[in-house]
Amino acid sequence: YSPEMVDGLTVGYGQGDVETTTGTKLDDTAMYLKYTYGSVTVGYQENERSAAATSNAIDFEAFGISYAVSDNITVAYNQSESKNGADADVQEASGISASFTSGGMTIAGVMNDVDNVAFDSANDTEGYELNIAFAF
């Protein structure tokens, strides 16, 4: 939904439930805000999963910002945090990306870091990617 009174603002909300097994119900709720002003876009999202078993309950929160330096170059930063109701370890992720486009060619790179993957304090990971794409 994009309210007319605030140009560049988009908001969204959704909810639903799933019965995974007989008598086991998961309630999911998600909401987001995105605001674009000129060449800057900022986004925020929250998700919540409620369940009778705390091991199935998850809270998720994310924030991101991107900046179009020019028509050809964009840089962005994102971070998120997930909490599991049955676990003290919080999964934290962050990433930086940049892209350059010229004609039909795009060169893009990302660096991501995730701590406590799957809520396991001994499971941290990093990832890097460089992508070159051509459109014909």
Language-model features: locations:
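Outer-membrane beta-barrel proteins
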Residues: 1-136
